């Protein structure tokens, strides 16, 4: 059928119009990010109904998630209703409003489930089956693997013995079990899992396939050998320009001859490469050589660097790809064949037994959905069944969203119910292979790529391909910079798809013409000498500064009104590859009182409230586990003190278990009676809960614990109470879900939790923040897919790719199979095998390709502005990245394949564009003006140097709260209506004062006034402060190992508090004696001296401020104060404030009748390049001006005299206010 002509004035682009109306053959729509694919998909469905008269239930629409399916169905229903209202006499539209409820708009799993429910008789299964929960499936599969391994231990086949010796350790079979599990999940992602498993051994037995693997490695090694040869020639060219380097040139000449032999005829001579030594040592560069080439020092260093690069590339090829002769590699494959075959047999046994167990329990999992559906739709020979033919007749079109994320089982299911071949089929597929980021879920992007390469724009002879490239989301600066990065980063070799004109993004959004460049921020870490913060913590602080800058200076454009509004918290998202940085960000945002939310799938089991409940459950299950028993005793529930625990243990120090020590203490006549009563009550509780757990499900046990000890109420009252409460209810709900499975009991529930923790799975902290809540969000790139935000901060760019799987003894790949290292049982030595080397190389290439696609997803989330945050140890590494090798229009293949992280590539590409110092052969273009507008980058690159003095943390040892202090509220028995009405109508005359805190610290007032100055509601800010309190570390942790930054800050304050002031100044020797005295008096810990910054204190002693204080008439240290805030703020009469201000001033001195206060400060700040001390001083003064003003006003109120003040920063110096 031909595509109708597009009328004038329609909103659709030409490509969108074709996507809506193309028919008569299979259609693949390559929809780039922000190109409106969902709108196109909905419009196509609507036009099928309105224009072609097709009933909505005759269309099968497959989405990736249930949420997408619901949204799609809602949109279609809405459009049908609108059309029906416009044409009320249309009977066809009226029918669609009824049929929409039966429409097949769902995930493929939902479609499969419906298929099974309708045709369960074909499968010979009980129709009353249910879907297994995650908990049940995990436990059942683990149980099955354990049982199957035990069965094979009974058989003790020689191949099995060799497998266990290779893949198990002396202590456990954990690695062996993990490999079996991975193989199971890989296999069931194929239409015929057992056939896939049977084929794993083929490369180990057939020489033809082994030859293919050697060729694969040869082709890959050619990339690195060619790059090595280029580096060697560059070294030669550079040395040729110099004097007195004949010996160096002679070595390089020999290497060039060897390399010429390896590359002779354009082929790689692998036997010659492995049979000869390469990379001879280069003679030292002597002082005489440097003197002779004093004008070419940089070139000399570059020549050495190029030769070093040559050696490393050759070493990589020889060690990673051809560490052994080809014949030896083939021989190893023969030795491994029986082991691989036996491993496949074990996995098939697991598969069969796992299926048997599921059938006996009458449960199905998601894998069963797909394979049972396939069983219904195919005959034994693989051809479509009669049922499949009926579905082919029924569905007039099949529409698949997110096609790039399908696997081969799902592809087979779709092929069974579609009609025709590609040239005359009815399959409509939408997706973007550049956003295929779910390989860990067995998604297979090659399915999309194969069709993309096979289909044509005009659709002649095969399927039709349509490229949706116009982006309606982002500003042109975001798009052009993204295009430029990927034009030089992604191709078929690395990235699996060519980023050409068809793939790139074209501007289509109606923004104004103002300039909003992409910002690439490079943070140069401060070393340990200049900062107590780790590199990750420094980056977190830096990100907060970017957020503050956005809130203060940036606006958001409204496309509908054509006007700007101020940026708010919810306009900003921080994207990271994983949640590894979440804790640092939470703390950094908390320090600045910026509302911040992480919807993490990690960290749930680390939450204090969850750990408490799990300790309780473990102690009830087995009180002989000391960690959990003592943890429960020390918790807020039972509140045993350290001294009490010590008393118990001292009485019987040789007991194996602490529980025994408790029993022995209770029975000891000399024991403390009060402690004995407390212990008896505790043990009574334990025994009572144990008895309760025998007769009740886990969720009821948890509920009883919550109610008995007011657990929900207690944690709800802490900072972050909403989230803590949600976490507690989340654990309760998980217990309910667990009890609904076929497993029962406390032991099984704990085992399930342990399995999740051990394998790194997590429930994630419960989400208590809605999509419209005004908070800064952090999310992973995966969870951001499909979303958009005005401001995107893409951070963590310098975090290395996770290549842990590449180091495993077994490498799995859907296309190639299984690569197992060779293990010599007699010598107990492991070697890379031909298969493991080849598949490891393939896996690394696929991993880097997927990481590139993740970068693409991250960059294309930004609507208005994009911030890229990288971090380096020193700025010298940036020069190396600028000089990264290129090949044609791309960063060289070897550089991309070995790239450690995204920053490595992004900075190299963008810095080359801006650099004026690198030679032309390292640039992509000689003239920037030659770049087309659509891919001309608009980016600001800034390098920021982090300088820091430890942030100050005030710890309160006196605050202690207990659930036992909660009082039970008593209901009154008053029933006189008049009295009730009088009480309900009563209005408290001082209601405004109730909204004011009775006591505030100066720091709290500082935060309040800062947020008021910025136009932010302070109460709103406080409401969203992250729920992580700062508690002092236990003494035994503080006394051992490295102190944290806040502990060092407290230590420095303690030293300054007692520091003597002498007119002649104290010497360094006297300072050491003074600190030894503090240790002797137990004012500071014995091991504290190593953490005291002596040089900084000596700097203070030698300062002018020290001299002024030493000559003062009076000196007061650590002076506490409490004063009425109304007096300090000088409020008018009638506006008195009931609040009081409480604080502590580090030091006050009196000189010449004038009172001065001194506040010692520790702080973190960014010293940007070129920043003067005066500018930093102004910055720090502004930061503390509110706090210092309160100190000044407070002292003037108390003393009724003029007061002046100083700030002293340990690493910066004195600032007078």
UniProtKB/Swiss-Prot annotation:
Disulfide bonds: none annotated. GO terms for cellular component: cytosol; DNA helicase complex. Its cofactor is Mg(2+). InterPro entries: AddA, DNA_helicase_UvrD-like_C, DNA_helicase_UvrD/REP, P-loop_NTPase, PDDEXK-like_dom_sf, PDDEXK_AddAB-type, Restrct_endonuc-II-like, UvrD-like_ATP-bd. The heterodimer acts as both an ATP-dependent DNA helicase and an ATP-dependent, dual-direction single-stranded exonuclease. Recognizes the chi site generating a DNA molecule suitable for the initiation of homologous recombination. The AddA nuclease domain is required for chi fragment generation; this subunit has the helicase and 3' -> 5' nuclease activities. Belongs to the helicase family. AddA subfamily. This is ATP-dependent helicase/nuclease subunit A.
């Amino acid at each position: 059928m031909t595509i109708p002509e597009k009328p004038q004035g329609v909103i659709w682009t030409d490509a969108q119009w074709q996507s809506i109306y193309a028919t008569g053959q299979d259609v693949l729509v390559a929809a780039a990010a922000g190109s409106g694919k969902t709108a196109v998909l909905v419009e196509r469905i609507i036009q099928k109904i309105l224009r072609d008269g097709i009933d909505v239930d005759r269309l099968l629409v497959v989405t990736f998630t249930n949420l997408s399916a619901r949204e799609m169905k809602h949109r279609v229903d809405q459009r049908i209703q609108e059309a029906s209202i416009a044409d009320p006499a249309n009977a066809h539209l009226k029918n669609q409003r009824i049929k929409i409820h039966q429409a097949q708009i769902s995930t493929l799993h939902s479609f499969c489930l419906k298929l099974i429910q309708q045709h369960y008789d074909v499968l010979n299964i009980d129709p009353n089956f249910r879907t297994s929960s995650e908990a049940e499936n995990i436990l059942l599969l683990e149980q099955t693997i354990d049982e199957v391994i035990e069965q094979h231990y009974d058989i003790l086949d020689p191949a099995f013995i060799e497998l266990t010796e290779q893949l198990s350790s002396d202590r456990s079979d954990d690695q062996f079990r993990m490999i079996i599990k991975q193989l199971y999940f890989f296999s069931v992602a194929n239409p015929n899992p057992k056939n896939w498993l049977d084929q794993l051994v083929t490369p180990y037995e057939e020489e033809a396939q082994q030859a293919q693997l050697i060729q694969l490695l040869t082709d890959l090694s050619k990339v690195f050998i060619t790059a090595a040869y280029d580096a060697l020639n560059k070294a030669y060219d550079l040395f040729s320009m110099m004097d007195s380097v004949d010996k160096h040139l002679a070595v390089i000449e020999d290497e060039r001859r060897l390399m010429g032999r390896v590359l002779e005829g354009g082929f790689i001579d692998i036997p010659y490469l492995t049979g000869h030594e390469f990379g001879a040592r280069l003679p030292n560069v002597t002082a005489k050589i440097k003197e002779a080439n004093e004008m070419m020092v940089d070139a000399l260093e570059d020549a050495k660097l190029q030769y070093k690069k040559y050696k490393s590339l050759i070493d990589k090829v020889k060690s990673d790809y051809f560490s052994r002769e080809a014949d030896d590699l083939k021989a190893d494959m023969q030795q491994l064949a029986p082991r691989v075959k036996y491993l496949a047999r074990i996995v098939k046994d697991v598969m069969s037994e796992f299926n048997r167990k599921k059938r006996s329990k009458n449960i199905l999992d998601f894998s069963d959905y797909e394979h049972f559906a396939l069983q219904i739709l195919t005959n034994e020979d693989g051809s479509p069944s009669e049922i499949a033919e009926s579905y082919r007749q029924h569905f007039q079109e099949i529409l698949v969203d997110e096609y790039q994320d399908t696997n081969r089982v799902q592809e087979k299911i779709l092929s069974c119910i579609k009609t025709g071949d590609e040239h005359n089929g009815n399959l409509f597929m939408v997706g973007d292979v550049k956003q295929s980021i779910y390989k860990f879920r067995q998604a297979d992007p090659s399915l999309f790529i194969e069709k993309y390469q096979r289909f044509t724009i005009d659709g002649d002879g095969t399927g039709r391909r349509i490229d949706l490239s116009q982006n309606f989301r982002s500003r042109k600066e975001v798009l052009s910079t993204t295009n430029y990065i990927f034009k030089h980063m992604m191709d078929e070799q690395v990235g699996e798809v060519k980023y050409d004109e068809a793939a790139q993004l074209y501007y289509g959004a109606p923004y104004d013409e103002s300039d909003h460049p992409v910002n690439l921020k490079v943070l140069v870490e401060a070393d340990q000498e200049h900062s107590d913060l780790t590199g990750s913590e420094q980056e977190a602080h830096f990100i907060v500064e970017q957020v503050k800058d956005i809130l203060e200076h940036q606006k958001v454009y409204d496309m509908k009104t054509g006007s700007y509004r101020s940026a708010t918290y919810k306009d900003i998202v921080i994207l990271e590859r994983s949640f590894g940085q979440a804790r640092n960000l939470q703390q950094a945002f908390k320090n600045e009182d910026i509302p911040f939310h992480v919807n993490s799938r990690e960290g749930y089991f680390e939450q204090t409230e969850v750990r408490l409940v799990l300790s309780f459950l473990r102690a009830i299950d087995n009180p002989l586990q000391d960690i959990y028993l003592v943890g429960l005793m020390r918790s807020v529930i039972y509140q045993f003190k350290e001294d009490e625990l010590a008393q118990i243990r001292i009485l019987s120090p040789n007991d194996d278990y602490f529980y025994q020590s408790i029993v022995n203490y209770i029975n000891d006549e000399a024991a403390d009676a009060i402690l004995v009563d407390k212990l008896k009550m505790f043990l009574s509780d334990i025994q009572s809960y144990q008895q309760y757990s025998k007769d009740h499900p886990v969720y009821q046990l948890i509920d009883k614990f919550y109610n008995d000890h007011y657990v929900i109420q207690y944690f709800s009252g802490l900072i972050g109470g909403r989230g803590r409460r949600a976490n507690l209810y989340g654990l309760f709900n998980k217990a309910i879900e667990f009890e609904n499975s076929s497993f029962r009991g406390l032991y099984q529930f704990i085992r399930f939790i342990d399995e999740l923790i051990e394998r790194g799975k997590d429930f994630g902290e419960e989400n208590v923040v809605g999509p419209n809540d005004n908070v800064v969000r952090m999310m992973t790139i995966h969870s951001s897919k499909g979303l958009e935000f005005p401001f995107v901060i893409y951070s963590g760019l310098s975090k290395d790719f996770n290549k842990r799987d590449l180091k495993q003894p077994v490498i799995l790949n859907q296309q190639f199979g299984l690569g197992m290292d060779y293990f010599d049982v007699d010598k107990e030595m492991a070697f890379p095998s031909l298969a493991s080397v080849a598949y490891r190389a393939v896996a690394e290439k696929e991993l880097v390709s997927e990481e590139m696609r993740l970068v693409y997803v991250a960059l294309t989330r930004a609507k208005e502005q994009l911030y890229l945050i990288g971090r380096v140890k020193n700025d010298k590494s940036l020069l190396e990245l600028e000089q990264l090798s290129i090949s044609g229009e791309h960063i060289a293949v070897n550089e991309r394949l070995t790239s450690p992280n995204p920053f490595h590539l992004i900075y190299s590409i963008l810095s080359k564009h801006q650099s004026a110092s690198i030679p032309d052969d390292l640039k992509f273009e000689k003239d920037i003006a030659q770049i087309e507008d659509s891919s001309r980058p608009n980016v600001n690159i800034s390098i920021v140097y982090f300088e820091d003095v430890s942030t100050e943390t005030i710890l309160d040892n006196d605050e202690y709260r207990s659930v036992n202090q909660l009082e039970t509220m008593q209901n009154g028995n008053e029933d006189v209506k008049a009295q009730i009405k009088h009480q309900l109508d009563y209005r408290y005359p001082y209601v405004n004062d109730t909204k004011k805190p009775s006591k505030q610290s100066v720091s709290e007032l500082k935060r309040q006034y800062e947020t008021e100055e910025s136009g932010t509601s302070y109460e709103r800010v406080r409401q969203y402060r992250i729920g992580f309190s700062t508690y002092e570390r236990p003494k035994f942790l503080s006394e051992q190992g490295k102190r944290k930054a806040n502990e060092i800050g407290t230590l420095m304050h303690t030293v300054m508090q007692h520091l003597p002031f002498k007119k002649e100044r104290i010497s360094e020797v006297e300072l050491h004696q003074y600190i030894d005295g503090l240790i002797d008096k137990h004012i500071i810990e014995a091991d504290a001296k190593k953490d005291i910054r002596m040089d900084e204190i000596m700097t203070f002693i030698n300062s002018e401020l020290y001299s002024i204080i030493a000559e003062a008439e009076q000196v007061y240290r650590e002076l506490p104060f409490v004063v009425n805030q109304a007096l300090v703020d000088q409020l008018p009469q009638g506006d008195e404030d009931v609040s009081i201000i409480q604080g502590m001033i580090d030091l006050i001195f009196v000189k010449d009748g004038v009172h001065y206060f001194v506040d010692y400060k520790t702080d973190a700040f960014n010293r940007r390049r070129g920043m003067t001390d005066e500018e930093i001083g102004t910055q720090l003064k502004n930061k503390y001006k509110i706090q210092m003003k309160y100190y000044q006003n407070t002292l003037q109120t108390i003393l009724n005299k003029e007061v002046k003040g100083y700030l002293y920063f340990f690493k910066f110096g004195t600032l007078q206010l």
